Amino acid sequence: VFMRDFEYAKDKVLMGKERRSLILSDEEKRITAYHEGGHALVAKLLPGTDPVHKVTIIPRGRALGVTMQLPEGDRHGYSKAFLQNNLMVLLAGRVAEEIIFDTITTGAGNDIERATGMARKMVCEWGMSDVVGPMTIGEQGEEVFIGRDWGHARNYSEDTARIVDAEIKKLVETARENCHKLLQENINLLHALAKALLDRETITGDDIDLLVKGEPLPPFDADGSAAKQEPAAPAPASADAEGETFKLEAEPSQDGGTGEKTQDETKQQ
């Protein structure tokens, strides 16, 4: 059992099983590369966000590509700034598509759903809207006989509902505008990340660090992972040994790829 086997199992649990049988066109691969590159770049550039662990454009589960962020430790609470930055990360894939292709696709459907849900909780549950204030809007009612999720207590007026909708939209639109500005200012890095994804299909957080610094990526194996060499082994103790050393080459992955997910997934709608 090698470390790559643990990595493969972890990726399968966190991101879903690879679907290499799903053949994407060159244009779909390019769109997915920029989409996932947008997520990864914004997550890398914004302070306080969870580090990017791995990015892949290999289809996994229902996703055409995945950007996986993993927290460095346990997190039991979230600041408003952290949530605002995460809204930007969620919307970065769609914004990257707009910038590069001057169009949008259905691939951002799950991202938009998650961003809207987060913004709604910020306004309605966590009191993070200056206009609405520290109030809970729309309490969940008791269970009703035809379904647990059917009953909702209507404890707010139509005017309040309009204000809530406006505040949710404001949070999402502000995040989108800030994300657009950040990606435009770092467009060369976005191109570099997309190219690396198209070349390798999967890149790691360490690869992203190198790309942001403008440094070349290390050679990679057939599975797309960086090729690493073990330190030289000592020469065998024999009479005819002439200082020979042996290096253990990294073995190729059995699965043919090591993809991973902000689960910011690019979802096929």
Language-model features: where?
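Active-site micro-motifs of SAM-dependent methyltransferase domains
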Residues: Y8, H39
